[in-house]
């Protein structure tokens, strides 16, 4: 994997609050190598180490995108949801930002069936077929469509399992992470001071609660993906 320069700026990360961890009582001892200090009862992440792993993650996604690989971004808590959707749309990635439905990856055949149903209902709605049904039937199908849009809207174009999954909050998205581990899908995780850095292929020590921190990390990663995609298109 070729190392590239991603303009990862320590001052910019400090301004976004990337270095602020959780309260010292909530920490995971496995995070000790990534913590530089305690301040007013919270752990402070070592941003030099963060920058190193952040750069490695950018190299990985660039390399994967330049080979035409597919990405899934997962972040369902309120503070992450909007940033996940906008970052994923910018880089033409799949995303889950409302709720990870158990078995979404490990029971892919069921997910695929739901996606087919979703696409069929969307097509019927677009063609005006739902409005020609009895009111009760139309209302039921519209509710079903709304439910599918909420939970599957970000993966509606997926035709198979992703090649790499980017996870915003390891604790919040543990079910998704566990499914990736089961299937051997490589993961990149933002890990706060209460997380286990050994569970992801690349762990980026960072504040996973601040919107500015989440947005900064995701924007850099999707910029690397976009550059990789451009390289893939040029070399086809």
Curated annotation (Swiss-Prot):
| UniProt keyword Ribosomal protein, yes or no | yes
Tell me the compartments it is located in: Plastid, Chloroplast
Any GO MF annotation of the entry: structural constituent of ribosome
One Gene Ontology cellular component: mitochondrial small ribosomal subunit
Q: Which GO terms describe its biological process?
A: translation
Query: Which controlled-vocabulary keywords does the entry list?
Result: Chloroplast, Plastid, Ribonucleoprotein, Ribosomal protein
Q: Which Pfam families does the annotation name?
A: Ribosomal_S2
Q: Which SUPFAM superfamilies match?
A: Ribosomal protein S2
Instruction: Read off the PANTHER family from this record.
Output: 30S RIBOSOMAL PROTEIN S2 PROKARYOTIC AND ORGANELLAR (PTHR12534), SMALL RIBOSOMAL SUBUNIT PROTEIN US2M (PTHR12534:SF0)
Family statement drawn from the similarity comment of this UniProt entry: Belongs to the universal ribosomal protein uS2 family.
Q: What is this protein called?
A: Small ribosomal subunit protein uS2c
Query: What organism is this sequence from?
Result: Drimys granadensis
């Amino acid at each position: 994997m070729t190392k590239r320069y991603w303009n990862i700026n320590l001052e910019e990360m400090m301004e976004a609050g990337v270095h602020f961890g959780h309260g010292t009582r909530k920490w995971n001892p496995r995070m000790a190598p990534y913590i530089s200090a305690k301040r007013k009862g919270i752990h402070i992440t070592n941003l030099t180490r963060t920058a190193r792993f952040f750069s490695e993650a950018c190299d990985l996604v660039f390399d994967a995108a330049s080979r035409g690989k597919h990405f899934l971004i997962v972040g369902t808590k309120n503070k992450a949801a909007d940033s996940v959707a906008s970052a994923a749309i910018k880089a033409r990635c799949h995303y889950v930002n409302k709720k990870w439905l158990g078995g979404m990856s490990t029971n892919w055949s069921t997910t695929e069936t739901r996606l087919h149903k979703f696409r069929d209902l969307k097509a019927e709605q677009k063609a005006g077929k739902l409005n020609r049904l009895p009111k009760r039937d139309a209302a039921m199908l519209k509710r079903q469509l709304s439910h599918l849009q909420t939970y599957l809207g970000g993966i509606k174009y997926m035709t198979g399992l992703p090649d790499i999954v980017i996870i915003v909050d390891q604790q919040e998205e543990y079910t998704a992470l566990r499914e990736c581990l089961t299937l051997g899908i490589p993961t990149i995780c933002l890990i706060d001071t209460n997380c286990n850095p050994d569970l992801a292929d690349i762990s980026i020590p960072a504040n996973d609660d601040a919107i500015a921190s989440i947005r900064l990390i995701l924007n850099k990663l999707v910029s690397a993906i976009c550059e990789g995609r451009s390289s893939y298109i040029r070399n086809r």
